[in-house]
Amino acid sequence: MATVRASLRGALLLLLAVAGVAEVAGGLAPGSAGALCCNHSKDNQMCRDVCEQIFSSKSESRLKHLLQRAPDYCPETMVEIWNCMNSSLPGVFKKSDGWVGLGCCELAIALECRQACKQASSKNDISKVCRKEYENALFSCISRNEMGSVCCSYAGHHTNCREYCQAIFRTDSSPGPSQIKAVENYCASISPQLIHCVNNYTQSYPMRNPTDSLYCCDRAEDHACQNACKRILMSKKTEMEIVDGLIEGCKTQPLPQDPLWQCFLESSQSVHPGVTVHPPPSTGLDGAKLHCCSKANTSTCRELCTKLYSMSWGNTQSWQEFDRFCEYNPVEVSMLTCLADVREPCQLGCRNLTYCTNFNNRPTELFRSCNAQSDQGAMNDMKLWEKGSIKMPFINIPVLDIKKCQPEMWKAIACSLQIKPCHSKSRGSIICKSDCVEILKKCGDQNKFPEDHTAESICELLSPTDDLKNCIPLDTYLRPSTLGNIVEEVTHPCNPNPCPANELCEVNRKGCPSGDPCLPYFCVQGCKLGEASDFIVRQGTLIQVPSSAGEVGCYKICSCGQSGLLENCMEMHCIDLQKSCIVGGKRKSHGTSFSIDCNVCSCFAGNLVCSTRLCLSEHSSEDDRRTFTGLPCNCADQFVPVCGQNGRTYPSACIARCVGLQDHQFEFGSCMSKDPCNPNPCQKNQRCIPKPQVCLTTFDKFGCSQYECVPRQLACDQVQDPVCDTDHMEHNNLCTLYQRGKSLSYKGPCQPFCRATEPVCGHNGETYSSVCAAYSDRVAVDYYGDCQAVGVLSEHSSVAECASVKCPSLLAAGCKPIIPPGACCPLCAGMLRVLFDKEKLDTIAKVTNKKPITVLEILQKIRMHVSVPQCDVFGYFSIESEIVILIIPVDHYPKALQIEACNKEAEKIESLINSDSPTLASHVPLSALIISQVQVSSSVPSAGVRARPSCHSLLLPLSLGLALHLLWTYN
């Protein structure tokens, strides 16, 4: 029954997502189908509200979002409402004859997969044999045909209409004009919905996308022909238009010996009609997974991995060898975790599972594969195990009757293996060794164990650790979540992913304009990192990928172009990863992290990179302890700020000199107090606009100008990018503000609580004119008033520096706060202290646009990896030369669950940095981040922790929440 309900609900979601649905204007009319359905939920007001929104929605994207969220409010046990919603829509129950994926089987690359496909009756039947990571064409075809079959169900009992419709979706080539015309002739009078549904697919049919052949343009010998070719493929749709355009643009007739036309002919004569044959892309078949190959500990696995993901498909033997020697080898945990990050990144939250229900309602836990397919997979695994044997790639484990012996434990194991909970720090997903040993001792058929094997030896192969930082204790999932159904405090708009396969989901931090309803996420165009890659990056971004041949330490930087392809790739100098560092007479290999006193260090290609904290040790004398300030070079805690050429304000000249600045490279006064446009450095036809920035690249090479020169325009564009001036007047954009002779206060709409220009001190030691001005610079506020103290850097520091500062009270419940380095006041947040390789940043800047790389760029990139809208990213460059990243709850009164979510996001990002995961390292300039230390606001049983009170104790948290919600779109 549960399966039926799930399939009905799935059909409804699928149907409404792909086909136009007649929508009701305004509310639901009494007696309408929608009203009758929603009456089934009269005892559940939240479900009723969602139901009414579904039937009255006028936006297809809004409808899709509501349907994805509906199971949260209308559980599957409400059979009547789900049956009613399905039955109120035509075509849902009709099942097509045969499996629609049958016509796709010839697209399978591996012979075993092709055979399994021909014998299958559903996608589930091939999931064990066919690998999604390199059978992209097959799975895309199946998914498209499954969705297309919904269109044909609108034909009802009209045989001719149904057959012509099915002919479109059962072919593995692009449907021709005659096929589409036949559907229109036979179906137009029967079902307009069917015609609309078919048109949606035929107009966007992906298998014959002209841009897939852009690489052919590079074969043209004439530069003008190359440009014409690219322009034509980007703008023309039909083959006739493209051929005519190429003849005209290249001034040549189609000749088989011409490299350009030869390339087009080869792609059109593919062995699989309709599937464009690409040359090996410049990124390899999968640039993200290729990044992981260098993490292999054995040369065998490194070579196999490189063979599989570089320039040519690995054969079946290569895959089998990789499975046998590498896929389950504990020695290769670093490479395997990296590959898992690419295939299935750890994401916060799990819900809506019907079998693995103990995994539901866990909004602050990380999972790799919390979805319906994995839920079904766990149930299927249990059925197989009930036959008395657990088949692993390298060993078969005989077991007793698991229906009678610890069934709940076995279910937790099956679900853990499929849903894959992962640690925020290690990102490991294996169960703990003690659980493995316990279950095999109780329920393993030990008389039939393979020769020389015991429960302990088998578990040594499967789950070699009991370290709770690296394994999952099953006890967690033997009972439901204690949170029940209270999940709205923390939401996950992009999990599960609501976007099409070629688009990237981003959290909507803009809010809704003028209070109108809108989606909590955006789907943005992106590029895949190779032909076989599912790893998508945002259009317009710079990406670092390994060289396509897979040489260790060799990378290139590419841009994600408008065509959806990586382009303009530039080779970087190879890094010698064999170089080691000598520390205290001991050799440290590349990538090794370790501590020296209170400092954290990392060896990066032979260079030792360490934090520059001043340390006290157990051997420090009493005089040392008495004079210890905790500041760099033990400088006095005097606050006489100076502005460095890198755009950073330092508390004193002593500290500026200590971090390496010469006397001519800083001047007295804070950077914010300087006017970079006086005297005017721009030409007469240009306007000077202040642009404060803190630069991480070498100043002498790339500069760090605090202004930009923009052309003076007679008429400004009407683009909506609101800014607020110093008189608290709002303007459409910067151009209109300066055209009216005003001065910028901050970016974003004017906020009522920032009308009074009361200064605030940011965590970076800079005084801002208002809370809003600080937030628009991605800097969180430490306290109200001008900056007046150096702040606390060490647990051994004196708190006398902050004695005169009045800190706001903490209004968060159950939080043991942290104090960011250089700040005075406590904060409930997750904090990262990150070291970076300055040489790598300089190399990136040199290879790309020759411009300096700033702290703001780093923060904006990190922000894209925080998936919970209830948390946002702020940060600064500390006086100890670390990038400090703060992940802060944005609600006015953050709940303990929200603080925990921000902590988990911080721990996740720390792990991705420390492991050099392609999830982050593929993004320029995040690839220069080397090592991170995390500190989180731990939970305490009391209702809250309060700092020293002040008259601003209520105002600052309220301002924080409001400003974050309203300003985050503009920064």
Curated annotation (Swiss-Prot):
InterPro entries: CC4_RECK, EGF1_RECK, EGF2_RECK_dom, FnI_RECK, FZ_RECK, Kazal_dom, Kazal_dom_sf, RECK. Residues 1-22 form the signal peptide. It holds the Pfam family EGF2_RECK. One of its GO terms (cellular component) is side of membrane. SMART domains: KAZAL (SM00280). One of its GO terms (biological process) is regulation of angiogenesis. A lipid is attached at S942 (GPI-anchor amidated serine). The Kazal-like domains mediate the serine protease inhibitor activity. This is Reversion-inducing cysteine-rich protein with Kazal motifs.
